[in-house]
Every structure is written in structure tokens, then in C-alpha cells.
Amino acid sequence: MHTQIRWLNIPLFLVLSLCCLVLTGPAQAQSSLSPGYAAGDAHLSPSARAGREIWFYATAFNDRFYTYSYAQRLGGGIDWYRILAANNKGDLFQAWGAVPDPDCCIPGDPNCSAKSLEETYGFQWCPGDAKLLQFVGREGYDKEDPACVFKDAPFDTTTPHGSVDQRQSACDLRFGTSTGALGLRKFPNPRFDPEKWRKLNGSLASWEAYGKFLSEDEKSGDSRFNRLFDGSIEPPFRIGMSCGACHISYDPLKPPADPNNPEWENIDGLVGNQYSRVSQMLASGMEPHVLEWQLIARARPGIVDTSALPMDTVSNPGTMNAIYNFDSRPKFLHRVLKWRKASACPEGPSATCWCEPQRTNKCWSRSEAMEPVNHILKGGEDSIGAAEAIQRVYFNIGSCAEQCWLNHVPDLRASDPAQRNYGQTPFDIGQCRRDCPSFRAIEDRLGNVVAFFQTARPADLHAARGITPQQLKAQLDSEFGAGSVELGRQVFVRACARCHSSQKQPYERVDFHAVVPDDPITPKRRVDFLSNENPIELRVVGTFAGRAMHSNHMPSRIWAEYAALDLRDRRVDPELREIMKGSGRGYYRPPSLLSVWAYAPFMHNNAIGPEVCGKPANKNNDFYSSPYVDQNDKPLANPPPCLPFDSSVEGRYQLFKLSMEQLLYPDKRPRKVTLADEDIIVDVAPNVTVLDGVEAGLSIKIPKGTPALKLNSLRYKDMLQDIVLMLRDPDRLEAKYKDILSPERRRELVQGLQQVRAELKPGLTFDLTKASDDFIQAYYSNVLGRVENGGHTFGKDLSDREKQALIAFLATL
């Protein structure tokens, strides 16, 4: 494989401000806008009801992030019209895995309040739009947002914050109205200029020209960017995202007859969307050959790399988990340094104790204490408390970006270590609380979200089939052989429970289906979480390494304040092959097996099991690319087909069985390695002016067919920095690696850097030899593993009879 490097231009962008007018009018509560949604509140406590509404609708002002900061600061582009155009309603689920909003309609359809696409700027008509559309191109919607009449749950008077309700204004939750896809919310853009829009697109209903690229000259950097990056023309809507965008999906117990047209009774907010193409959504306005597309969009359905924006140069997409039996999740005693509620602050710095202005007794004190906490995320990295982990999700999806975290994330093309945003710096929770009203609005209501989480119960297969547990056992024994469920239980006790049970040994005496008796707060909660939640070294589980090397919670990284002090001090797995390991420690937390029948394929990256895909009518939005390769990592000549999305009970069950076959027979798994399906251009260095005024910037071209991980987990900045040190300050390079590499490895490092430098010949283009490419991967890749569906071979030595029995038993959990 040859890696080609060349010089090319990198464009800059501006945002122009427009003057706006003001309208006024009464806001409407979200529950009154959607009776179908409100029906789901009937069985909930006031606190859980409030938490559900926040989970489904609150964006916490991240619409600004996706409209401005995402493109201008991080180089990402989203073509919202490509996703959300009313005429694409039938493809929302098939192309993007999005859940269509049952309350929205296509303008012009019978019984739809909007009669033309001009009225809605090409989008669907949704509840609340009669008010919202009045503010397109005008100021004033912030006070008319449905969040402003959000019905708060009763205030908790038992905390140090006292008995007076001093919660941040609910307006700062920022709901907007639906886009037609649940979890994606729209807001009127006060900067919108209808005349500019008509001139560009020919109609208020169209966005077509807005998505076209700025230049047809392939030699120009503008050929890789479109109007989404051009601030001189702004769209009619700003689009925000709630947590529900990734977690709302179809209820395994009541799936829709037509997934393209669900009813509210088919929808659950906590099951996790295993069909979601949110990664492709976030890159929908970019060409596949640019770096940002590769970093963001390289994910199969149902997984997303949550560190792609606060980039840690580790490609580690993970599943959007179902949230079941929250109160049964194990907790562990850890050293936790965090902010806790206080009624007053002594004299001292605000960095350790701070009281909110114009509030009484509403203070926060930062201190260290031993505290029982959950292990959240795939490696247990979120480890200072469940409430804090929930709030961090809002930052991961763009909330408080300008006030709190954009200046802590790296610029992908900052090549000078002394340059601002060359690398990560830690997010400051105290500073964000002080400066971002949306932080406080969410934080003041985290208890409500937790209360909503506590309502989720497993989706049992017997309930999905409408039969009793005894009848299900009889069906499974008939399918897999007499006595299979009981034999499978014995196999589970012997081979699985050590990792996949939260109860104590001896497991022979454990009832894995038991519920907590007479629990008035969380009725029918299962006793067993079906995971011990203890992080396991990667070498033990053996699955794809990417997620275990996630490093954003380590010291000096962006989410450092969200990690327990002792948990992040775990040793690096000594058997990792990477020579200079990234900051990740190399651990995985065993996933819960609750309702495992409904959530195949398996593993943190959905890679063990058949590939699944939607079947969109618009083939330009068909993102399936076969990952199947031969032993030489070349595309398989006749790869297995992907299975179509199927949310039905039988569809989930059949996918479960096929995935279990691959899990328990690892030698039969077809090899999966994601390859670049287009040439990839990586703009590395900023523009410089050379002779005759020519502007150029360093760029790397990765050819089609290269394993995507060669790029996605490459610390190319470190490599460039080391080349400079080798040339200008070799003593400093020696000191940098003295405590990391052996003398032999340090000599090999210098020799490799010299070889790479020698191949940087004068001219606009040069090639790297295979030897240099191998050196770069060995020394500068955070993840050397390429096979995505390897590992977890624990059941391979079971007999065929035991394997089939285990599948039968797992179907009952």
C-alpha cells in the first residue's frame, strides 16, 4: 500500500449577521401539542413524567452548535434537507434509522394543516409549527418555546439547596418542534433571509442549491465544501438534537406493523436505537473522501463514535444501549472528586466552592470522597455518578459548546504543538455551570431523568409473544430439543454467570429471572442486572480493541473530570500490541444480557452477527458497504448480503439466533474489516505562502481499499511533531520517549522517522514505501487490530448440544 502526500488549499469561512424583528404570543405545552405522546405519561410519577419530556425534547440550545460551531470550528457538515425533507418521510427509517414522528404530516396531504411545502420550507408539518413558523427570519421565539411552559415536577426540598424552588428557567431546556424524526428538533432561524433563499434555490420549499458544492474545479479546496459551510446564506431552521435521537426506538414488545409509519404505542424512549444511522447524519453534508467524514460516519447501524467530535484519535463507535433495570445496576466504591450540593461557601476560590448569583443557599462545593458509583460507558469511564453521566451526554451532543467545551477540543489540522487547540484540555464543570444557563437547566432536573430511567423494564420474549414464561419454555424446548432451557441454564451458570450476573455465587442457587418483591417505587424490577459491570482487560475478552482504547476520560483529556480518580489509574493492559499506546487503558465492561434476544447483532460495535441495513428508495442514501474481507483483507468476492431492518418480534428473534451462532462458533465467522471505499484526503497542515504567492497546505491521500482504521486511529500530529524534533532538537525527542520506549525501540523510532523524512522529496507529490507505512502504523496507531468481529471465544469449546441449549436459555432472559 502506498500513502500519497500532496499540497493543497484549505478554505476559511465567515458568518454574517442579519437584523431581525419580534413577534409575541402564548407558548403551548408539549403535552398539549401531542396527545399521543402524552398518553405515555399516564403510568408515570410527576418526576418521571418530567424526565421523559426532557429526554425526548430538550436540546439545551445545541441547535447553535449544529448550525454554526460544527461547521466552522470542527469542519463537519450536516445536510438536514437531505435527511428531513418532507418528501423523504418514507425513507427516514430505511435510510437513517430514524423513528418517524407519528404526529407530523406532509403538507398537502389530507388532514394536514399545511397545504404547501412553501409554508414549511420543505419540511413536514408538526405540532407547534403554527407558532414556530411565524418566527422564521425574526427574533423572539426563545420566549415562545414549548419548554417555557414545561410543567416541572415538585421540587426536592431534602437537599442542601433548601426548600425554595430556585431551578434555572425551563426555557433553557429548549424544546422547539419536531422535524418529523423523533429526537431531532427544529427552531426558527432569526438570521434567515427569504429573498436570498429564493434567489439561491428558486423556491422557499427547496434546499437543493444550498447543498451543492462551491466549486466544480477538483483542484480547488472549495470542491469539497458546499453552502452548508458558507455563512453568507443561512437556512430557515436551526436543527437541534435531544438525547432521544439515539435512544428512542421501536418497543420490542409492541413493534409497528409498518416501521415507516409507527404509532406512539410502538415507541419507547429508552430501548436504544439499534437501527440509527446518526453517524451518517452527522456527515451527510460532506464528501466521503474528507477526513471528517471518515472520522464521523464510519459506523454500522446502531453505533456511534461519541469521541469523534472531542477527537481522541481512536476510532471507537459503540452501541446505543437499552436502559433497563437502572436501579439493579451494580455500584462500586471509588475515589470521586466532583461538585456536590452545598448550602453555603466559605471564603475561598470559586474553583472549589461557588454559589449561584441571585439565589439563596444554592451552592456547589468540589471535594474528594469515597462514593458508590456506577460504571457507565463501555469501559466504565463515566464513574463519578449516574446523574453526572447523564448530563455529560448533553455536552457530547453539542450543548454549551461555545461557553464550555469547544476550546478544549483539538483542531484536526493544528500541526504546531504550541498552537491553541493542538490537543485536548479538560472540560471544567464548575466553569460550565457558571457560564451556561442550559447546563443549570439540565442539572437542576437530572433527578427527573433518573426517575424516568427507573421506569424501564426488560422486554421479555414471552411478553412479546403474548404468552406465559412457561409457554415460552415449552416453545423453546420444542425448537431446540427437550430440556434445552434447563440445560442452557446449567451451561450459563458454569460458563457465563461469572461475568454476566450481578448476583453472588454460588450461581447454581441464583434465580436469574427473579424480581424485587413488593418494590413500590420500581415494580417488577429484575434483581439481576445480568452483568457484574467489572471492567475486564482487553486481552481476556479479545474483541475489537477500539472502544477499550477510548481516552477522553484520562488526565489532561476533555472528560477527565467525569472519571473516578482510582478507576482512571488502572494499569495499561501489558499485552496490548501497540508500541506507544494511547491514553486508553484497554478494558471492557461486560454488557447486560437483559432482553438479549431483542438486541442482536452483538458486541460493543454490533459486529458479531449478520450485517443489517435499511432499503431506502433513494439509493444515494444507501450507506451499506460490505465489511467482509478475505484473509488478505481484500473485499470478499461473494459477501453475505446484509439483512433488512426488521423490528418485528420474529425478525429480532431470528437475528438473535443467527448472531448467537456466530458468537458461539467463532471459526465460522466471516472476517470483517472496514475498508475505505473512496480515496481519502487528509488536510494536515494550515496554509502557507510559498514562492510567487502560491498557497499550500500539507495533505495526505489514503487510497481506496485501505483499512479505515489506518487513518481513523492514527496520531499523525505526533508523527509530524517527532519529525520536526528529530531534525531540530534530537535531544528533546530522546527525552520525550526515554521513559516510554526501550533504547532499541528509540533507535528504531529515529530510523523510521528518518526514512519517512527521506521520502518527502521536493515537489507537490510524494509516496511512502510499504516499510515506512508499516513503521507509521506500528508507532503511531492507537489501534493495530483490524478485524472488527473477533474475540469473545468463551463458548467455542461447548458441545453443539450445549450451544443450542444456551441459545434457548438466553432467549428467556
What are the language-model segments listed below?
Residues Q4, N9, L23-L813:
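Periplasmic c-type cytochrome electron-transfer domains
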Residues P11-V22:
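Bacterial N-terminal signal peptides
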